[in-house]
């Protein structure tokens, strides 16, 4: 039992050797395809209440995950935890690594994989890695382009390259954010971004939210002088 191990020089040397072995083994475990999210459940976390004697093993494991490409990512690869972000599953489901790269100016992979349940062992170990959060408040800040024309242009170019199906998911995400007060009203008032996709004969066109109208249900043809939201982005 752990409690029966004496804190002496010989045992400290053995403990330090175990810590080194754990770190050395992690890359081999990853290369064998076994370093999945479920594996994190077997690693020590802060709620285990381990005695100070065993802390070097925990610290070595955490440092390895932060500094080496060991942390499972949403894209299926592994990356240093220090270079990753964690966010709500609903945001991660809409914004891929390349999308997050636009807002963070960092190189993918960027999203850490999310555990199946919060506050379980996998989640507790991920919390110990101090992965940077990127959630609703960060999204709200990223979309506030009132004083940043360059960022506004980048977002408008980004939106113009998206499919109608993706735009539907993105609008739904924003709608939920505002409905649940996750995105600030302040942000809403300052979103001067042309990202509402409207009906156009040739190419997708985007306008400010205040410039677009939802068409009546029975409308099948659209006049050129009124900017109607493209039905395929909200139906």
What is each PLM-predicted segment?
Residues 1-235:
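GHKL/Bergerat-fold ATPase module
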